[in-house]
């Protein structure tokens, strides 16, 4: 969810540990980098562009990436994401997952739990939990879980759908 205001204001919403505007600018840049928000540089006023109901309308993928940037800007130790890449292409998704792993300027590197419906997203995870009837029935890497018939079946159904 984004709010009417500048890109910068949206990203810094909930951030309370900044001591200077220079530190805020650095935090915004790092969050935008990890969340693959390079489109922000092309906005009329960059991070100062007003978005939302009172401003520029963004695509679903752009909104999704800015929301992720905001979540990263608070420097969480645990990051919970619900299908965060559903509106993104696979290349952008891979870029973001790698950036989440490696971090940038003190951001990223958090333990990240995410739900995913695309097999391509699941395959990028370090560890996958298989749920059946609300219970964890297996956990391992995607490659190892592919040895289980119920997991293979689930992945093939998702590929088709």
List each language-model region with its residue ranges.
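Hydrophobic anchor residue at the start of the ABC signature
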Residues: 68, 115
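ABC-fold ATPase nucleotide-binding domain signature/coupling loops
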Residues: 3, 28, 37-66, 84, ...
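Short coil-to-helix "N-cap" segments within the ABC nucleotide-binding domain's helical subdomain
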Residues: 17-33
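A short, proline-enriched helix->beta-strand linker immediately N-terminal to the Walker B motif
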Residues: 73-77
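Short helical segment in ABC ATPase nucleotide-binding domains corresponding to the A-loop/adjacent helical element
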Residues: 3-4, 8-16
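C-terminal portion of ABC ATPase nucleotide-binding domains
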Residues: 13-14, 19-21, 43-46, 91, ...
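Catalytic "switch" loops of ABC-type ATPases
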Residues: 1-3, 117-118
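Catalytic Walker B motif of ABC-type/P-loop ATPase nucleotide-binding domains
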Residues: 79-83
């Amino acid at each position: 969810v984004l709010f009417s205001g500048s890109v910068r204001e949206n990203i810094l919403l909930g951030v309370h540990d900044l001591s200077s505007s220079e530190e805020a600018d650095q935090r915004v840049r790092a969050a935008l980098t990890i969340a693959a928000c390079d489109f922000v540089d092309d906005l009329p006023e960059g991070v100062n562009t007003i978005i939302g109901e009172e401003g520029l309308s963004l695509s679903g993928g752009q909104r999704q990436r800015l929301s992720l940037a905001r979540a990263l800007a608070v420097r969480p130790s645990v990051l919970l994401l619900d299908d965060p890449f559903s509106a993104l292409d696979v290349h952008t998704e891979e870029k973001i997952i790698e950036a989440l792993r490696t971090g940038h300027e003190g951001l990223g590197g958090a333990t990240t739990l995410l739900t995913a419906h695309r097999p391509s997203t699941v395959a990028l995870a370090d560890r996958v939990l298989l749920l059946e009837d609300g219970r964890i029935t297996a956990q391992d890497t995607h490659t190892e879980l592919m040895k289980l018939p119920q997991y293979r079946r689930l992945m093939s159904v998702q590929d088709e759908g």
